[in-house]
Amino acid sequence: MSSWNYVVTAHKPTSVTHSCVGNFTSPQELNLIVAKCTRIEIHLLTPQGLQPMLDVPIYGRIATLELFRPHGEAQDFLFIATERYKFCVLQWDPESSELITRAMGDVSDRIGRPTDNGQIGIIDPDCRLIGLHLYDGLFKVIPFDNKGQLKEAFNIRLEELQVLDIKFLFGCAKPTIAVLYQDNKDARHVKTYEVSLKDKDFVEGPWSQNSLDNGADLLIPVPPPLCGVLIIGEETIVYCSASAFKAIPIRPSITKAYGRVDVDGSRYLLGDHAGMIHLLVITHEKEKVTGLKIELLGETSIASTISYLDNAVVFVGSSYGDSQLVKLNLHPDAKGSYVEVLERYINLGPIVDFCVVDLERQGQGQVVTCSGAFKDGSLRVVRNGIGINEQASVELQGIKGMWSLKSSIDEAFDTFLVVSFISETRILAMNLEDELEETEIEGFLSQVQTLFCHDAVYNQLVQVTSNSVRLVSSTTRELRDEWHAPAGFTVNVATANASQVLLATGGGHLVYLEIGDGKLTEVQHALLEYEVSCLDINPIGDNPNYSQLAAVGMWTDISVRIFSLPELTLITKEQLGGEIIPRSVLLCAFEGISYLLCALGDGHLLNFQMDTTTGQLKDRKKVSLGTQPITLRTFSSKSATHVFAASDRPTVIYSSNKKLLYSNVNLKEVSHMCPFNSAAFPDSLAIAREGELTIGTIDDIQKLHIRTIPLGEHARRICHQEQTRTFGICSLGNQSNSEESEMHFVRLLDDQTFEFMSTYPLDSFEYGCSILSCSFTEDKNVYYCVGTAYVLPEENEPTKGRILVFIVEDGRLQLIAEKETKGAVYSLNAFNGKLLAAINQKIQLYKWMLRDDGTRELQSECGHHGHILALYVQTRGDFIVVGDLMKSISLLLYKHEEGAIEERARDYNANWMSAVEILDDDIYLGAENNFNLLTVKKNSEGATDEERGRLEVVGEYHLGEFVNRFRHGSLVMRLPDSEIGQIPTVIFGTVNGVIGVIASLPQEQYTFLEKLQSSLRKVIKGVGGLSHEQWRSFNNEKRTAEARNFLDGDLIESFLDLSRNKMEDISKSMNVQVEELCKRVEELTRLH
């Protein structure tokens, strides 16, 4: 049964909705704060660029984000209001680097009609009050007292009903607002009001301005000394104050965002709907405004926010394309643009459609999305895990270890790759043709297995074998010194760095050597009570060539110990528990924090934070990476250090926001890895797998990889055709001038290169609404079917459309058949060898007929009326599930004998659907326009017709995201041996660029996780005191109901980021061991 569902985010929202700049984390630091609908990110502006400081979820959809500075404060506070009428004031706590809540509250009213034009939240520049416009005809005031604390809120009646914008004016003795509104004759005006806090009412303001530009949409208040306000229209810009009125015409455009450049407010950046950025200058003599000037600077992504940072650097936040960090130059480039893009921040939003395909044919799903809009439209290929891009490979069996060596210590690149086998050691090097070929290092022993090698100080190399340690010159390649194991002893385990060697011989002997110029000196020897299983002396202190600590893994008592060097004094001993010995230990530092990693023989990995001065270990965490022994090695990529864990499920361990993250590598089993940074293959890795050695470069280190295919137009529908290895898309061309009607196309793309192979233009006013790849009964060909609508300006709903059937021949789209329809073809499905179409309010079934002349046509077989608009359709067997514009979900059945479709059951609630999917025979999933998810159940066991005719709502959840599409599939390799491999998953894509996964869990697992979720709610407090329970409660205009049969995977997986103490609190409340909790939550993270 798919009643118990787990909802988790695989890709966080990336669409930027708000941004602001100020001194938030300290009085001296300049911060950029970015809102991505349900998350906020805090960045620090440094000479090197933006440095992320915090990224946290907000339990609400952010409607307002404003920085302000209450009286007597040295730095700014952050005000956030959410769409569900909650607000909070946040302050930065430098001690814990977290947000503290200064104030919070609920500003909803029992009665009141929510505003059509979105909520407005503004703060008086003198911090006397916060103003909110949430309901038509009401202005809510939250006053500050003189200590900067918030007092009780009250409402003031506002006679303007169609409010477009409200802003506080600067330099007014009493708090004053300017209101831009539209009257009932569609004319636009601005009025000003003083807010009297004493009388809790408005007083007529200092000025008003009637009959503005019909497209006036935005007010920009101007700070002192000039004061007043700018009114931005589609064809004019007006400056207005009590004493002045100036206007200039502009090229027709819709301004979407603005950013103030100077403190005195004389210059503003304006971003329009086409991504053009302008500079608006208020010319003035002292405090008298003399005029306005506007200049085009260049093109950016289509801006939803603009924040001027410093030194001509600007953040452009976008909801329709990638956000950007740009520099405004004094002189234009060759194309006449003053805008230079310094950095791009990927945004998948809005994901209008997507499909799940296995492009590499490796059994791993990739999601290909239709992302962005207008000129910023693109396809994005999203896959989980880190790819290795193979540069060279050679067949080699039985590799036991690998190390790279330089020809001198200060060389930038590696020269040699030492490969060790059971009874020999081979040395490979790059020849002049950039090929790996065998060479010799005369001082190395080649007829034995090498246990360890390393570059050493004084241009030397060190080789450890089972009998000796050899020190060799890297320039002459001759032996300079050798240390022999005592008679009767052999070296079992060894490690080294540039100036130290640590090895263990049988019988628990630990021997420590130091490397001099041509000299190996045995410095210390210790006898331990058990055999040693692994060693590490990777330097993580200030000296890159010398370590003061050694990590030693032990047999028998299954412990890891930290010794000091050179004394070999035991500092710390940590029992690992269990029967499995440590196979690999590693000292490493990520983002300035030192860790000890310890890998066990069964694929588990423990990590500890480590105090390098005392050697003490804390914050122990255990994760399961695979099922086979793991070997750990560090490597660097883009100047950051990461760790590669080689095993049956190779993994890269890295750090982000001071948390350790694990990302799977898209390779089957890897036995050994070492960095190999050669001149021919810079920043590469050498990887030993079953029977071969591969040299390859590694992708950027992150969990999801996103490849962008810019289209320069808006792709609206996509599907993949395996047989022809192509994608079919319906797209809308980007017309530069708005006079022409827009053009729509069906395009064919190669599924590897993503190049356009063929294009079929649709008629004028014809939109592509749906696309499908399918085959028909008694016809072995595979076709692309496209459903269209003629969208005519004078019609409310399309009254005609077409179904087009194409075949791909020699890489071209050939039209085979077309069928006119009496409406828009919103959805197409392959159905029992026929074609099922949703056309306006009806469902229509077509069969594929062969005419006498050998041509083919679609012939209508039967249909079903009874929908408002049948927008989304899914099928399974003979069942058809329909998502309606406003009548929720209904279930239809096709009857073969009668050749008819009839309604079986429906959900009688009024839900405006945005997507549907079938989870199993009886449970159907839907998303609707209030950002909720719901599941309904077919009640075949019902006693009466009435019961059987009702789809019962069994699950409800507030996702807080608008879902455009569900698809069955997975982003991860399905490993048959894991429990997770058996869990069915559905992927969804949203307007804010979220890719999420809904997993249907067994009941026992669901019940366990439900307990964990409620324990976590008590421990993890929402930012700003916002409640998780309220946030996830199903909510529409009519009712609010607690979430049921859906769990929040993002909250559950945040368990892994808690400190050990908090984990233990939860473990006590649930009566389950911390390790067991970690293991079960870890498993879930593998779903995405």
UniProtKB/Swiss-Prot annotation:
GO terms for cellular component: Cul4-RING E3 ubiquitin ligase complex; cytoplasm; cytosol; nucleus. It holds the Pfam family Beta-prop_RSE1_2nd. One of its GO terms (molecular function) is DNA binding. The keyword Signal does not apply. One of its GO terms (biological process) is protein ubiquitination. The keyword Membrane does not apply. It is found in: Cytoplasm; Nucleus. InterPro entries: Beta-prop_RSE1/DDB1/CPSF1_1st, Cleavage/polyA-sp_fac_asu_C, RSE1/DDB1/CFT1/CPSF1, WD40/YVTN_repeat-like_dom_sf, WD40_repeat_dom_sf. Pathway: Protein modification; protein ubiquitination. Keywords: Cytoplasm, DNA damage, DNA repair, DNA-binding, Nucleus, Phytochrome signaling pathway, Ubl conjugation pathway. Component of light signal transduction machinery. Involved in repression of photomorphogenesis in darkness by participating in the CDD complex, a complex probably required to regulate the activity of ubiquitin conjugating enzymes (E2s). Repression of photomorphogenesis is probably mediated by ubiquitination and subsequent degradation of photomorphogenesis-promoting factors such as HY5, HYH and LAF1. Plays a role in DNA repair by forming with DDB2 the UV-damaged DNA-binding protein complex (UV-DDB). Component of the CUL4-RBX1-DDB1-PRL1 E3 ubiquitin-protein ligase complex. Component of the CDD complex, at least composed of COP10, DET1 and DDB1A. Component of the CUL4-RBX1-CDD complex. Component of the CUL4-RBX1-DDB1-PRL1 E3 ubiquitin-protein ligase complex. Component of the UV-DDB complex, which is composed of DDB1A and DDB2. Interacts with RAE1. Interacts with WDR55. Interacts with ATCSA-1. Interacts with DDA1. Binds to ASG2; the subcellular localization of this complex depends on ASG2 farnesylation status. Binds to KTN80.2/DWA3. Interacts with HTD1. Interacts directly with DHU1. Belongs to the DDB1 family. This is DNA damage-binding protein 1a. It comes from Arabidopsis thaliana (Mouse-ear cress). The lineage of its organism: Eukaryota, Viridiplantae, Streptophyta, Embryophyta, Tracheophyta.
